[in-house]
UniProtKB/Swiss-Prot annotation:
Annotated Velvet domain residues: 239-422
Compositionally biased region (Basic and acidic residues): 423-437
Subunit structure: Interacts with VE1.
Alphabetical GO biological process terms: sporulation resulting in formation of a cellular spore
PANTHER family associated with the record: SEXUAL DEVELOPMENT REGULATOR VELC (PTHR33572:SF17), SPORE DEVELOPMENT REGULATOR VOSA (PTHR33572)
Family that this chain belongs to: Belongs to the velvet family. VelC subfamily.
Residue segments, region Disordered: 67-131, 152-216, 422-460
Record's compositionally biased regions (Basic residues): 451-460
Functional note: Velvet-domain-containing protein that acts as a positive regulator of sexual development. Dispensable for regulation of conidial size, hyphal hydrophobicity, fumonisin production, and oxidant resistance.
Gene this chain is encoded by: velC
Keywords: Nucleus, Sporulation, Transcription, Transcription regulation
Descriptive protein name: Sexual development regulator velC
UniProt subcellular location: Nucleus
GO cellular component: nucleus
Length: 460
């Protein structure tokens, strides 16, 4: 500050002390939100005319706001009021508010360069910020935004009364209110927490390995390679060494063509039964029995011509949308004992029908499915195939009738195999026998219906 400003401040202070005081001290206090109030501290002696100049000229953040001598200062408090001393300041009003005028009462205490708080507030604060302090604060905030983080000495929210304020070049340097300006500490990086619940990158040096969340447990990770290999049977590893054979224990003989409707459908008689055999000298009986009890064998059935070289599943061109062989064309294995008491693996086809008359063969294909590799392999290889003997499909007039169920069929039925039992009928001898199956009932009902029609035609 120049010498001229100091002399001007000293002259102004003398003129203010010489002015008559005409306003009473009982003047109401101005609004608490628009006045910056100051109070001297009797703990220290006056510091000179420089502090008197600061008492009259206060700086606001929006510009220099000159506070005239008519404003009431905290030194003009009544006798019964005892302000608390301190080195802070309090800003009771808004930054841009204009204070109200107050007459200057007579002095009761000598002015001091130390500041105290008003009796209307209990918070401690510091003196107003000078333009240089505001510029310094703005530069610090700019450095913080640009990544340059200066190191600040630790500060306290309250200033001790025993420590006098420091001055630079004869000027009192105001302190900064730490309640209003948060201190800048050293920079700490906190990695953001994502909303999707995924852990942060483990390669980052700021991430602790103990804070990482483990990946969710998957069932595929629980099964080790050894457990997976043990869950598979030994047939997978020795398929090329084993010799699979199919023996048709019950050959199809005759069938009645069912046409192109679903109502008048007849099954192939007798129902085909195929047995799986494994012949390998390197395997014991227990190992062979284990292979035969494998539950994931699947056998499919298709129809071939009389020679057995051409697939006859497709119909003539006028009925291209339909198949010749209909019914349940796939069978699961059934492990049981035959009529001789020997255990075996059987595949039964009790629901096969042919649409057109002719001579045909049935073609059986065996496939072994591995459930573990079912998602990886689109098609499993064929183990073995077999063809039946030639059977004849008759029209409704030429069909000789159903045969009685064999001992093998009855034996498998007793053990739980899903297959129908028939007593059989012989049309050549004009004998009718009741059948406990649906096919036998349909044949008997059809014969009765035909007899009624003949009687009606004879009466007419």
């Amino acid at each position: 500050m120049s010498l001229t400003a100091v002399e001007t401040a000293a002259g102004t202070s003398q003129r203010l002390n010489a002015m008559p005081q005409t306003m009473p001290e009982a003047m109401p206090h101005p609004h608490a939100t628009t006045i910056m109030k100051w109070a001297p501290d009797t703990h220290y002696p006056p510091q000179g005319p420089v502090h008197s100049y600061y008492d009259q000229h206060l700086y606001s953040p929006t510009g220099q706001l000159i506070v005239g001598p008519d404003h009431r200062r905290p030194s003009q408090l009544q006798q019964h009021q005892h302000p608390r001393t301190g080195h802070g300041y309090q800003l009771n009003g808004m930054p841009g508010s204009v204070p109200q005028n107050q007459p200057h009462p007579p002095h009761s205490h000598p002015q001091s360069g130390l500041y105290a708080t008003d009796h209307t507030a209990g918070q401690q604060a510091g003196p107003p910020q000078a333009p240089s302090a505001i510029l310094q604060r703005n530069s610090e905030m700019l450095d913080h935004a640009q990544g340059r983080h200066p190191v600040y000495a630790p500060r306290s929210h309250s200033v001790s009364e025993d420590q006098p304020p420091t001055s630079v070049h004869g000027q009192h340097r105001p302190s900064i209110d730490m309640c209003a300006v948060p201190p800048f500490t050293e920079y700490h990086f906190n990695p953001p927490v994502t909303t999707n619940g995924r852990p942060p990158d483990s390669n980052s040096p700021m991430v602790s390995p103990t804070g990482l969340r483990p990946d969710p447990m998957r069932i595929a990770d629980i099964l080790t390679t050894g457990e997976r290999s043990r869950s598979r049977t030994s047939v997978d590893n020795r398929l090329s060494d084993n010799r699979f054979n199919l023996q048709i224990r019950q050959q199809p003989v005759a069938a009645r063509s069912c046409g192109f409707g679903e109502r008048d459908r007849r099954v192939i008689d007798p129902p085909p039964i195929v047995q799986l055999l494994i012949k390998d000298d390197s395997l014991t009986k227990e190992e062979i029995a284990k292979h035969l009890r494998y539950p994931h064998y699947v056998m499919s059935c298709s129809i071939f011509d009389e020679s057995g070289s051409c697939d006859a599943s497709f119909m003539p061109e006028e009925y291209r949308q339909q198949r010749r062989l209909m019914g349940l064309l796939v069978s699961a294995p059934f492990v049981g004992k035959d009529e001789h008491g020997e255990e075996g693996c059987f595949f039964c086809f009790p629901d096969l029908s042919c649409r057109t008359p002719g001579s045909f063969r049935l073609h059986f294909t065996l496939v072994k499915i591995d459930p573990i590799r079912a998602k990886e392999v689109k098609r499993f290889p064929t183990l073995v195939t077999a063809q039946s003997e030639v059977f004849t499909v008759y029209t409704a007039k030429d069909f000789p009738g159903m045969q009685a169920s064999t001992k093998l069929t009855k034996r498998l039925k007793e053990q739980g195999c899903i297959i129908s039992i028939k007593k059989g009928n012989d049309r050549s001898k004009n004998t009718r026998s009741h059948d406990d199956s649906s096919d036998g009932e349909q044949d008997e009902g059809e014969a009765t219906l035909q007899g009624k029609r003949r009687r009606r035609s004879a009466r007419q």
